[in-house]
A protein has these predicted regions:
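C-terminal regulatory or interaction extensions
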Residues: 151-217
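DNA-contacting interfaces and partner/effector-binding or oligomerization modules
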Residues: 23-181
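N-terminal ordered "arm"
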Residues: 1-31
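Residue-level detector of conserved catalytic or cofactor/ligand-binding positions
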Residues: 216-226
Length: 226
């Protein structure tokens, strides 16, 4: 249930009208649909064409299904400010699934060849504060800033990003960042010592993270573990 709850908290909206998640990743939209189906709530996935490319929308809008969803998460849908309910986390696996799915819904990561930066973006102030506290509780050392009206929770230290990716179930991506970091350190050391250029090895993981994370969650997010 915790993973499905993250979709509600970090999607486009979540209230008495239902829930909507928009994403450029078709796999994420269908993953959200599968999560809700496992919880006994039926949703739909549609594709919308935009100038920048297709956007995939997962939604629960049928009144009967919306009522089941709200009861499942313990919300009325009329809350003036949306806040995360700790009661929806039964164990450590729930917290892992929630944070990992939140990243699928609103997270980004830069190419580690260029810089180390992992972010969660949300327009919901209190939810962002709570997510920041969750990450801090697990020693991922997050920071928060307001950028263009959106709350940005970001982690810049490579070792903390590696730890978070491993925590979320994307251990392979964490290892690739570690490899790139070691290469960058050796390259910088070599440049300082010999003042020469070294070969540029491409190990981009940005696109791969969401794919691996979704696949990992599909395997670990059984109904008894959400």
């Amino acid at each position: 249930m915790a993973a499905a709850y993250a979709v509600a908290c970090f999607g486009k909206y979540f209230d008495d009208r239902g829930v909507v998640l928009q994403t450029e990743n078709e796999g994420v939209a269908h993953f959200a649909q599968k999560l809700y189906r496992r919880c006994g709530v039926q949703g739909t996935v549609i594709s919308k064409e935009r100038p920048t490319g297709p956007v995939y929308e997962f939604s629960v809008k049928d009144p009967e299904e919306v009522a089941k969803m709200l009861a499942l998460f313990g919300h009325t849908g009329k809350e003036p400010t949306l806040r995360i309910r700790p009661e929806n986390f039964k164990c450590q696996n729930c917290m892992q699934a929630f944070i990992a799915t939140a990243f699928l819904c609103c997270g980004t990561m830069t190419d580690p060849e260029k810089s180390y930066n992992l972010e969660f973006l949300s327009t919901r102030h209190y939810l962002s504060q709570q997510l920041e506290a969750m990450l801090a509780e697990h020693n991922f050392h997050p920071h928060r800033a307001l950028r263009k009206g959106a709350n940005t929770i970001y982690i810049k230290a490579a070792d903390h990003i590696e730890d978070l990716l491993t925590f979320m179930g994307a251990g392979g991506a964490a290892m690739r960042i570690m490899d790139q970091r070691m290469y960058n350190e050796m390259r910088n050391k070599t440049n300082r010592l010999s003042n020469c250029e070294t070969a540029n090895i491409s190990k981009s993981v940005n696109a791969a993270v969401q794919v691996q994370l979704a696949l990992s969650l599909i395997h670990i997010s059984e109904p008894t573990r959400l």
